[in-house]
Amino acid sequence: MRNQNIIYVPFGVMLEPNEYKEYLEQGWYPATNDIWFQTRSTRINLELYKPTKTVLRLAKKIKYFPDVNMTPAKRERLARIYDKYIAHKGYSDDMSIDDIISNSHGHIYYVYNNEIVAFAFHKVVEDAYLGIEFAWDYGEPKLSLGHVNVYYNSLFARFKRCKYIYLSSGYESCSIYKS
């Protein structure tokens, strides 16, 4: 395969709300409120999910707050966490905190030592709880906040009578916490 080129073409589709569930089950995920993209999404069946003892122990160290109101001070703190997160992961900054907020129905933020250290934005589509964005500041890596976030998302998803949690794309080693 000499002299072969790979052409990357981003592909998205605009859906009606009554189509969300069908497309979600086929591997599509919301990039924005209007545009969905095809991905290898990770899905947790809530009937089968059981957190480990380690996750339950770590979760006790973290205070969590479900919230739908966004104050300017909190927005600024979450933006700083997001900036640290994408820098730590080496990701490109293709979304702003405002994009994330507008593409969600609500969020959870996590407090450790009286500081907000992480957040998770979500939306609900029928019986599915979708993780829109999760980020943390990596100030205390031993907290394993990715695993703790999955646990708390499972509690909120069950409360909202969801059957599944979708945690967006799952590629490579950076998504191991989703498994």
Short names for language-model regions:
Residues M1-N69, A73:
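Acyl-donor-binding surface of acyltransferase catalytic domains
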Residues R57-K142, F156:
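A conserved beta-strand-loop-helix scaffold within acyl/acetyltransferase catalytic domains
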Residues W28, Y82-Y85, Y166, Y177:
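Aromatic side chains
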Residues R2-E22, S104-G106, I116-F119, K123-S179:
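Acyl-donor binding region in acyl/amide transferases
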